[in-house]
Amino acid sequence: MNTLRMVDPRDSIRVSTIDDGFVGKVLQPYYEHSRYLKHASFQQTDSLEPQSLIMNGEFAIPESCYIDDTGHFNAVEYNICFNQICYVHMAHCIKNALIPELSDDYDMDTFYEKQLPNVLIAKLASSYQSQLNAKHFYGTYGINAIKKTSKCTFIKTYCHFHDDGDGRSTGEVTLAVLAP
């Protein structure tokens, strides 16, 4: 999994906090007890290349929404947390017209209407380097590549999670975003 990002030292990096109300609206399709993304921030460089658009999030899973407490972060929770940080990243990029491949087809109303049926996971690979504390952890989401076709936009992404200790999980996900 190649996800190392080289930043041109001439580019300035801007970090902005994503409003919690915006996060809440994007995560509205989730039941309250399964909204694991608590806070998010967005960073971008002057280049505005899709690879420079990165979201960081703070997560907490007080109790699993589907199983007794396993005591650790697992593949199902990876997928749910990935979806949540991905949706917030995508919504922020559409709102601010940062990714033309998406902004050409979607505005915010269309995104909210189509986020569940039109954002598909085509491929997901995740790995767990060490046990991650699901009660409080952090995630980073970014884009490796984008390819737009007439019916679909394919987005190759990465998403990594870590806790305050040694807990680590990494993954790469290919999305297929259908044209509305």
Feature names for model-found ranges:
Residues 30, 86-93, 161:
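Hydrophobic, Leu/Ile/Phe/Ala-enriched alpha-helical segments that form helix-helix packing faces
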Residues 58-62, 129, 176-178:
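A structural detector for beta-sheet-dominated domains
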Residues 91-138:
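Hydrophobic beta-strand-centered segment that forms part of the acyl-chain substrate-binding groove
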Residues 1-76:
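Non-catalytic linker/capping segments at the edges of enzyme domains
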Residues 38-48, 124-129, 141-146:
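Short amphipathic beta-strand and strand-loop transition segments with alternating hydrophobic
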Residues 2-22, 131-180:
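HotDog/MaoC-like acyl-thioester-processing domains
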Residues 71-89:
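A short mixed-secondary-structure module that forms the rim of ligand-binding clefts
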Residues 48-50, 114-121, 164-166:
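A generic structural signal for short, non-catalytic loop/turn and secondary-structure boundary residues
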